Amino acid sequence: MTKTKRVAAMMMAAAMGTSMIGVIPAAAEEERETLKLALTQSSMVTDYENNYFTKYLEDKLNINIEFYMLPADAAETRTKVNLMATSNEDLPDVMITDGHLTNEMILQLGDSGFFAPLNDYLNDPEVMPNFNAIPDEDREDILQATTMADGNIYGFAAYEPETWNLTPNRMFINRAWLDKLGLEVPTTTDELKTVLEAFRDGDPNGNGVQDEIGVYGFAGGSYGENTVDALMNAFIFWNGGLSLSDDGTEVIAPFTQDAWREGLTYMNDLYNEGLLSANIFTDDGQQFKAILNQETPIVGLTTAGSLSNWPDVKNNKNFAEMEMIEPLKGPEGVQYTPYNPYVPGQEMYIINGTDKLDLALKFADEFFNIDTGLIERFGEEGVDWTRDPKDLEGQTNAYVEAGLYDKLSMLVISTIWSDNQSQTWRNHGPRYASLEMGNTVYDYSSGNKFDVNDPTQLNAKSYEMYYPKHPENVLPALKYTLEETETIQEQLTTLPTFVDQCMAEFITGARSLDDAGWNAYLDELETMGLSTWLETAQVAYDRTK
């Protein structure tokens, strides 16, 4: 018998104050309860009703899912959710927003009573057995990351760390130029300057023109392209914002420290010697890629998180000359890299007051089942992915080849992630996948086995070179109260922009690094409210201990 469902734009109805008539299940399915789910849609999912993952959940939990689609756009989703909370009519039981809600919005919706607090349920193995089966350390990370400033947890999280994304400022040097000039790979900032001088003066690209760019990057890039950030980490840990003291007790502003000034002095010297391009601060992403891919290679050193900056990377002659190197050591032995600590994203919420609370909790907990999580992310087992030992035989990946893991856990065997499909919800929803699970997957959808000689297979090398290069104590994502957010709202916007601007000005000489210039900079930061930001951040950090 055909199943009857409704896929409705509930948010629009809520905005107009209209009611929505419930669906009467087919007679043969009357024993099944119906769960109303508001779900952020994906343009790449062609059908949610006749969808493999939908049917998997319905059959396993013996339920009917009634969909209310939220927009794919994050801003539109936030608007719709606010309208729903305001109208308080035709509410779903559960909501999945694909991480589109900000921490401030989650706290506000929880504080107002729209989202149900989840603390007691998450900590009860009888209510959420799958969640409580997560290894203790990972489960504690999830609980800590999702605890809001009021002490409550309102969202079920997706936990699926990938080391490649944690350290995107990977440094690449032109190895062909090093070889031509008889130079070794630099390991320190002083050695780098010597190499850059040789690049400048030795015509390593062989075109008879002094067109070589020593250090190049894209300061406006969001995925590792800001080379000056990478260089600063040879002097002090810089992650793009506030950080922690060495002992992990105090929130500090690294951009006010003496070591920061020393890093600026080093890069200003490179700039004055013609070894660091000022275009780092003015070029956009398109120009960045164009410079990296000139007919005659002209870049000596850059940083990038994605190899897509070199189109057709396996056959790209510019990339063929580059080699990824370790973060550089500074004069005091500092050797860090910008590091984005993994933060589990809040994905699913239960609407407070639902009369299907037990079912909603059962539904949420199912997403933390390992098999369900694999289907949620990769599709149908045996069709889109496999963990059959016979299929895994003879297969490997970069992490296994590097000896970091003994064997693969699964193979991806379809192009489901890049195709329009009705197999999954595109990984929208909570999920648990350990770091090992993520690192022991190989994408075999092309039918090509892992090639140990493929120069683009850098995941394991990046893991070894970059993942350990951060301080023991790293400032977590802070959860501010509504009052705290109001207090520092201006500082959160203006101060990071000002620091980036001054960084460029100090390096290019537009601002002086003498005592007068440095003190003027510190005074400006104070006038803009740095102390207020630090004090508020300290209070928020202390709540996490």
Protein language model regions, located:
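N-terminal secretory signal peptides that target proteins for export/translocation
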Residues: 1-3
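Conserved N-terminal structural module of periplasmic/extracytoplasmic solute-binding proteins
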Residues: 6-9, 17, 21-171, 175-192, ...
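Extracytoplasmic/periplasmic substrate-binding proteins
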Residues: 220-241, 245, 268-432
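Loop/turn elements at helix/coil->beta-strand transitions in domains of secreted/extracellular proteins
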Residues: 31-35, 61-66, 88-93, 113-116, ...
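Conserved small-residue motifs centered on glycine
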Residues: 372-505
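Carboxylate/His-rich catalytic cores and anion/metal-binding grooves
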Residues: 106, 111-145, 196-199, 207-241, ...
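Helix-loop-helix "hinge/cap" segment bordering the ligand-binding cleft or interdomain interface
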Residues: 119, 148-226, 245-287, 291-294, ...
